[in-house]
C-alpha cells in the first residue's frame, strides 16, 4: 500500500506511522509523511519519505497524491485554543488546507481512502446526556466550527464519489507523551504525565468535570481499522464517533493514586481557568458506542489500564 499521513511529525502521526510499518495485515510499500517541519522517518525505515510542506499552499502535493495512493490520513491541524486565538490561521489551516487536499484527491484519485481526524469540539451548548450518531453538531468554538465544516465537506465529496471518505471523531486522547501544547484539553494528559515523571502540573478545571477519553494506542488501532473498513454506501453518513469511556477528573486522580500512591497528588496544583473549563465542559462526556463497536472499532477497558499503558510504552 501507498499511504500519506499529514501532520506526520506530530505525536499521532509518528505513532500511526510506526504502527503501520510494523503491521502484518497491512503491507506498506510507500509511506509519505508531510508536516510544516520535515518529519523524521520512524526507525529510519527505507519505506518512508518525508516532506516539509505547508498545506495552505500545497505546492508539489499533487505529485505525492497519485493514482497509486491507497489512503490518506489527514491529521494536520492547529489545535483548539490556538484556533480560538487566531481564527484566520485556523480557517486556513484546518479548513482551506483540507479542501486543498480533497481537490487534489478528486483530480488525481477519487478512489483514495481519505481518513479525517475530527473532534468532540464539533459538539457544544445544551447537549443530551448521551450523544448519538444522529446528534446534530453545535460547536461553541472556532476550532469546533472548522472541524464541523470539514466533516460536511468530506461527506459531500464522498456522496459525489470524489473521494472514499471516512471521518473519525476522536475522544480526548490521554495520556499523550511529550510536552503540553495549546489545546484546551492539554491539561488532561499533563495532570497525569508530569506527576508520573516527578514534575508539577496545573489542573485548570473542576474536579467534577467529566471527560470522554481514549488511550493513544487505541486511537491508532482505530485509525488502522478505518483504513481496512469496506467502502461505505455513497448515500450513507461517513462520520463515526470513535469509542471512548467517560471519567471525571476526580476519578482520574483517584486512579492515579491507586497506581502510584497518594503522594503523587502533591505534584498537582489547582488553578481554575474559566475559559478552558468552559471550552472543555461544552464537549460531550458520554457517547453511544454501539455503531462503532459493531463496526469493529476498539475501546479501552478502564482508566487504570490507560495509566499502565503510558508507563509501559511512553516512560
From Swiss-Prot:
InterPro entries: DenD, Epimerase_deHydtase, NAD(P)-bd_dom_sf. NAD(+) binds at residues 119, 143, 147. One of its GO terms (molecular function) is oxidoreductase activity. The active site is at 143 (proton acceptor). Keywords: Carbohydrate metabolism, NAD, NADP, Oxidoreductase. Its EC number is 1.1.1.410. Disulfide bonds: none annotated. It catalyses: D-erythronate + NAD(+) = 2-dehydro-D-erythronate + NADH + H(+). Gene3D superfamilies: NAD(P)-binding Rossmann-like Domain, UDP-galactose 4-epimerase, domain 1. It holds the Pfam family Epimerase. Catalyzes oxidation of D-erythronate to 2-oxo-tetronate. Can use either NAD(+) or NADP(+) as cosubstrate, with a preference for NAD(+). PANTHER family: ADP-L-GLYCERO-D-MANNO-HEPTOSE-6-EPIMERASE, NUCLEOSIDE-DIPHOSPHATE-SUGAR EPIMERASE. Belongs to the NAD(P)-dependent epimerase/dehydratase family. This is D-erythronate dehydrogenase.
Amino acid at each position: 500500500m501507498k499511504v500519506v499521513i499529514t501532520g506526520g511529525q506530530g505525536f499521532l502521526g509518528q505513532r500511526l506511522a510506526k504502527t503501520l510499518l510494523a503491521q502484518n495485515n497491512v503491507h506498506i510499500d510507500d509511506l509519505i509523511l508531510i508536516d510544516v517541519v520535515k518529519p523524521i522517518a520512524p526507525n529510519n525505515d527505507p519505506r518512508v519519505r518525508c516532506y516539509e510542506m505547508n498545506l495552505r499552499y500545497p505546492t508539489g502535493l499533487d505529485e505525492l497524491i497519485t493514482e497509486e495512493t491507497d489512503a490518506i490520513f489527514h491529521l494536520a491541524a492547529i489545535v483548539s485554543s490556538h484556533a480560538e486565538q487566531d481564527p484566520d490561521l485556523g480557517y486556513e489551516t484546518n479548513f482551506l488546507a483540507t479542501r486543498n487536499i480533497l481537490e487534489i484527491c478528486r483530480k488525481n484519485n477519487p478512489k483514495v481512502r481519505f481518513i479525517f481526524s475530527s473532534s468532540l469540539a464539533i459538539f457544544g451548548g445544551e447537549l443530551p446526556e448521551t450523544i448519538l450518531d444522529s446528534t446534530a453538531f453545535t460547536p461553541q468554538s472556532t476550532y469546533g466550527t472548522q472541524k464541523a465544516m470539514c466533516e460536511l465537506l468530506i461527506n459531500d465529496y464522498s456522496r459525489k464519489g470524489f473521494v472514499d471518505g471516512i471521518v473519525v471523531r476522536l475522544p480526548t486522547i490521554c495520556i499523550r507523551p511529550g510536552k503540553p501544547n495549546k489545546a484546551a484539553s492539554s491539561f488532561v494528559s499533563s495532570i497525569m504525565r508530569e506527576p508520573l515523571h516527578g514534575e508539577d502540573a496545573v489542573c485548570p478545571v473542576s474536579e467534577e468535570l467529566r471527560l470522554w477519553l481514549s488511550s493513544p494506542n487505541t486511537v491508532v488501532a482505530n485509525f488502522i481499522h478505518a483504513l481496512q473498513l469496506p467502502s461505505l454506501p455513497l448515500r450513507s453518513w461517513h462520520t463515526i464517533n470513535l469509542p471512548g469511556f467517560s471519567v471525571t477528573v476526580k476519578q482520574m486522580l483517584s486512579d492515579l493514586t491507586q497506581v502510584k500512591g497518594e503522594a503523587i497528588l502533591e505534584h498537582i496544583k489547582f488553578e481554575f481557568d474559566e475559559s478552558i473549563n468552559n471550552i472543555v465542559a461544552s464537549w460531550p462526556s458520554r457517547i453511544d458506542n454501539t455503531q462503532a463497536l459493531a463496526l469493529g472499532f476498539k475501546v479501552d477497558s478502564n482508566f487504570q489500564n490507560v495509566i499502565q499503558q503510558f508507563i509501559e510504552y511512553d516512560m
